Regions:
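Bacterial N-terminal signal peptides that target proteins for export
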Residues: 1-8
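A structural "domain/chain start" motif
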Residues: 3, 18-70
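Residues embedded in well-ordered secondary-structure elements
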Residues: 9, 32, 102-104
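Bacterial N-terminal signal peptides
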Residues: 10-18
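Solvent-exposed, acidic/flexible segments
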Residues: 50-54, 104-106, 130-138
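Surface-exposed short loop/turn segments
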Residues: 63-64, 73-131
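Short secondary-structure boundary motifs at beta->alpha junctions and helix caps
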Residues: 117-151
Length: 151
């Protein structure tokens, strides 16, 4: 009987953990596919917590062989982005660090991330995160943009 209770508890905990995980990040509208040579992103970080987001984004995109360049957060509006060689602009807006405890650790944030297609100038992702771990968000973001790469 104790074994059955432990197994039932393990299944309930597994479902509880799985239900707390966020789904994939979806693109808004249609976006033209890219080839491997266009795997370049330009990133603008809001100065507060930029180090954490930079580290996680470089890891998530670096593993997938994306080239990453940075631009100052306040320079985005003044720069002619059409002349840049990157394909996408990722803007990590001001993030609020959450005091959230989890079994796995991690740093949790709430805020907004926008992604623009620099070929068209259109916003393709507007992701409002709420108490999510930064590495999970950057990994899902890399997967969403990686889905546009043709083989």
């Amino acid at each position: 009987m104790k074994i059955i209770k432990k197994m039932f508890l393990a299944v309930v905990m597994l479902f509880a953990f799985a239900s707390c995980m966020s789904g994939p990040i979806n693109l808004t509208g249609s976006v033209a596919p890219i080839n491997s040579s266009q795997k370049k992103v330009l990133v603008a970080y809001y100065p507060e917590h930029a180090g954490k987001w930079r580290s996680d984004l470089e890891t998530s995109f670096g593993i997938r062989k994306w080239k990453i360049n940075e631009i100052g957060f306040w320079e985005v509006e003044q720069t002619n982005l059409r002349k840049r060689s990157e394909t996408f602009l990722i803007v990590v807006d001001k993030m609020i660090k959450e005091n959230h405890q989890s079994m796995l650790g991690g740093t949790f944030f709430s805020g907004n991330i926008s992604v623009y297609d620099l070929r068209t100038g259109n916003k393709i992702i507007n992701y409002n995160l709420s108490t999510e771990e930064s590495f999970d968000v950057t990994t899902r973001l890399a997967k969403a943009l990686g889905g546009l790469v043709t083989k």
